[in-house]
A protein has these predicted regions:
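N- and C-terminal low-complexity/disordered segments
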Residues: 1-101
Length: 101
């Protein structure tokens, strides 16, 4: 049985190549506001939500014991299909759960 809930978030899944690619696509957006440059930027796990596009909640390892939680909206192909960062939470740790914000 699928874990897709219409309008709901999936369970947390291990990050894959697609998730890492999304992170690479939005890294510059994430670094803009706090004006930080992350040498490490590796997707660890994620959740997703199908809306008029796809919302992603991604845990990203940025070095040492530091993690970010990213909210990324992936637009539908008819709307250019781009990823846009809609939220960033700093100061997370490896075992922190991914909770929509």
């Amino acid at each position: 049985m699928s874990d897709v809930i219409c309008g709901g978030w999936t369970k947390t899944k291990k990050a894959d190549e697609q998730t890492q690619k999304i992170c690479e696509n939005v890294k510059n957006q994430v670094e803009e506001e706090p004006q930080k440059n992350y040498a490490e930027f590796h997707a660890v796990e994620y959740r997703s939500q199908v809306v008029a596009g796809i919302n992603y909640l991604i845990k990203v390892h940025v070095g040492g014991t530091n993690y970010l939680h990213l909210m990324v909206f992936h637009k539908l192909p008819c709307n250019a299909g781009q990823e846009v960062v809609t939220g960033v939470q700093e100061h997370h740790h490896k075992d922190d759960p991914l909770v929509p914000f």
